[in-house]
Design a protein with these regions (language model features):
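ABC transporter nucleotide-binding domains
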Residues: 1-174
Length: 174
C-alpha cells in the first residue's frame, strides 16, 4: 500500500527549533519535515552536530530548557504536540507511545542501577505492573532482545554489558 493512502502516525512539517544563548536566538533546525507510518522504521542520518537529536527530542518534549519549537507543526496520531506544555502532558505519550533509542546507550541507562531494575521501572511506569510480575516481564524482555543468561544479566550493572548489549537493553526498555 502506498504511503499516500495512509495517514502517518507522526508528521513533522517545516519544524524550526531555536535556542536562547547569552541573549541571542540561535536557529538549530530550519524547516525540517518527515512522515512516519505505522509498522515502518525510520532512520535519521546526518553529520555530527547537524541537529538529528534536537529534531527528534522535540517529538518527546525533551528539548533543553533554553530550546523551543519556533515554527512548523508536529502531529502525533493527529494531535498537535505543540499543545503539550507540561511534563504531565508529555508523560501520556513518552515511553508509552513514542520512544527513542539513542546511539550511545550509556546516556540512557543509569550506571548506578542494575539493568533488571531499570527495565522493571519502565514496566511499572508504562504498564502499571509491579513486583514479581514486573520482574518476570523484565526477564522476558531481556530474553526477547537476545541477552544471553537473562537471570544473571538482570542483576548486573550497565558497565558489565558490551555496547551492543546495552543498546538491546535500551530497546527492551523502549
Amino acid at each position: 500500500m502506498a504511503n499516500m493512502e495512509r495517514e502517518p502516525i507522526l508528521s513533522a512539517r517545516d519544524v524550526e527549533i531555536s535556542f536562547s544563548l547569552r541573549g541571542k536566538k540561535l536557529n538549530a533546525i530550519r524547516r525540517c519535515s518527515l512522515d512516519l507510518y505505522q509498522g515502518e522504521t525510520l532512520a535519521i542520518v546526518g553529520e555530527s552536530g547537524s541537529g538529528k537529536s534536537v529534531f527528534t527530542k522535540s517529538f518527546l518534549g525533551m528539548l533543553d530548557a533554553n530550546g523551543s519549537i519556533t515554527g512548523g507543526s508536529i502531529l502525533f496520531e493527529g494531535k498537535d504536540l505543540a499543545k503539550y506544555k507540561t511534563e504531565k502532558d508529555w508523560m501520556t505519550i513518552r515511553g508509552k507511545k513514542i520512544s527513542m533509542v539513542m546511539q550511545d546507550p550509556m546516556t540512557s541507562l543509569n550506571p548506578l542501577k542494575k539493568i533488571g531494575r531499570q527495565i522493571e521501572e519502565s514496566i511499572e511506569l508504562n504498564q502499571g505492573i509491579k513486583g514479581p510480575e514486573a520482574k518476570k516481564m523484565a526477564l522476558e524482555m531481556l530474553k526477547k532482545v537476545g541477552i544471553p543468561d537473562p537471570e544473571r544479566r538482570y542483576q548486573q550493572y550497565p558497565h558489565e554489558f558490551s555496547g551492543g548489549m546495552r543498546q538491546r537493553v535500551v530497546i527492551a526498555i523502549a
